[in-house]
């Protein structure tokens, strides 16, 4: 069934003794899609299918996720920096170093924008889907469920013993209608044992909340880099019923990316590419076509002015 739902060739990159799985479909300018937690490259399957005839679609599974290896702590240090290093190594191995359309979701925002902060000149467009690339907004407390997973033995038992994080997310992450049995099973399938759920837990434990926490300075540095991208053509599609990446995060993105095209989906949750797949993919394809047309018609120095005019046109809000 998985081969039917994810009909792409498997590719693997060796990373310090671990195999990192990635999708690499199509030819043309690269579209790099970075997933979060507790999902995997499966999240982007429909977008890959929609774009692979015209673009090179690259979708890694982070170590510990999807079809990548899932080593214990002795075999991999589950940190944000290592995630960014892995993404850089993958793109370097594919010689992908320019004209990147970067698509990010959940933790993928921090990882993807961490890469972008290192190489801002490589980024052509940004597509932002229910994610963050900055510290928890002052107006947003850490949800209790994440606090329990991050800080307690009970959280460890629930996440690694009962797959609570991945399983529950497959239910509450969509709002329009439930995932089908087969789609839900595909989301949770890689996390099928205590050992194979290590990444799901380590991601939550890696959330920095205060100075001195691991990754706190790195997140600060990534956030500080965002002004470099204020004039990069940006599309934001946002499910407003996400209990983690909610309107507080969207407000921060609007501040950082004042020229972005923004589409809000009032009846959608965290997994917006499941809740509103056809609509979001249509927005992405239109955005890419529109910005490509502008890039070929106007002086690059003036392209943001043209893009601003387009992005400020009336938007249909759902």
From Swiss-Prot:
InterPro entries: AB_hydrolase_1, AB_hydrolase_fold, AB_hydrolase_sf, Epox_hydrolase-like
EC number: 4.1.1.114
Keywords annotated in UniProt: Lyase
Superkingdom to which the source organism belongs: Bacteria
Role: Involved in olefin biosynthesis. Catalyzes the elimination of carbon dioxide from beta-lactones to form the final olefin product. The S.oneidensis oleABCD genes produce 3,6,9,12,15,19,22,25,28-hentriacontanonaene, which may aid the cells in adapting to a sudden drop in temperature.
Membrane as UniProt keyword: no
GO MF term list: lyase activity
Cellular compartments per GO CC: membrane
Transmembrane segments: none
Organism: Shewanella oneidensis (strain ATCC 700550 / JCM 31522 / CIP 106686 / LMG 19005 / NCIMB 14063 / MR-1)
Principal EC category: lyase
Disruption phenotype: Deletion of the entire oleABCD gene cluster leads to the complete absence of nonpolar extractable products. The oleABCD deletion strain shows a significantly longer lag phase than the wild-type strain when shifted to a lower temperature.
Name by which UniProt lists this protein: Cis-3-alkyl-4-alkyloxetan-2-one decarboxylase
Statement: the UniProt record of this protein carries the keyword Membrane: no
Catalytic activity: a cis-3-alkyl-4-alkyloxetan-2-one = a cis-alkene + CO2
Homology family: Belongs to the AB hydrolase superfamily.
AB hydrolase-1 domain: residues covered: 30-275
């Amino acid at each position: 069934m998985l081969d039917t739902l994810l009909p792409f060739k498997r590719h693997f990159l060796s990373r310090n003794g671990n195999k990192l799985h990635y999708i690499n479909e199509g030819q043309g300018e690269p579209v790099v899609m970075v997933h979060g937690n507790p999902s995997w490259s499966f999240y982007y399957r429909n977008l890959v299918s929609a774009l692979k005839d015209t673009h090179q679609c690259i979708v890694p599974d982070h170590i510990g996720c999807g079809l990548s290896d899932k080593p214990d702590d002795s075999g991999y240090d589950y940190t944000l920096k290592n995630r960014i290093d892995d993404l850089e190594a993958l793109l370097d191995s594919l010689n992908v170093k320019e004209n990147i359309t970067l698509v990010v979701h959940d933790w993928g925002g921090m990882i993807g924008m961490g890469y972008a902060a290192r190489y801002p000149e490589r980024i052509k467009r940004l597509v932002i889907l229910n994610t963050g690339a900055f510290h928890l907004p002052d107006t947003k407390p850490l949800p209790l469920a994440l606090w329990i997973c991050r800080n307690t033995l009970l959280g460890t038992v629930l996440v690694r013993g009962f797959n609570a994080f991945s399983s529950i997310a497959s239910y509450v992450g969509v709002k329009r209608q439930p995932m089908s049995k087969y789609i839900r099973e595909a989301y949770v399938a890689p996390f099928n044992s205590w050992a194979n759920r290590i990444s799901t837990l380590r991601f939550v434990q890696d959330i920095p909340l205060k100075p001195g926490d691991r990754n706190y300075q790195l997140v600060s540095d990534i956030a500080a880099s965002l002004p470099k991208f204020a004039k990069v053509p940006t599309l934001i599609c946002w499910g407003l019923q996400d209990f983690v990446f909610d309107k507080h995060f969207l407000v921060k993105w609007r501040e950082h990316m004042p020229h972005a095209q923004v589409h809000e989906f009032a009846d959608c949750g965290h997994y917006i590419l499941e809740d509103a797949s056809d609509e979001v993919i249509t927005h992405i394809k239109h955005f890419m076509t529109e910005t490509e047309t502008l890039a070929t018609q106007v002086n690059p120095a003036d392209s943001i002015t043209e893009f601003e005019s387009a992005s400020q046109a009336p938007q249909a809000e759902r």
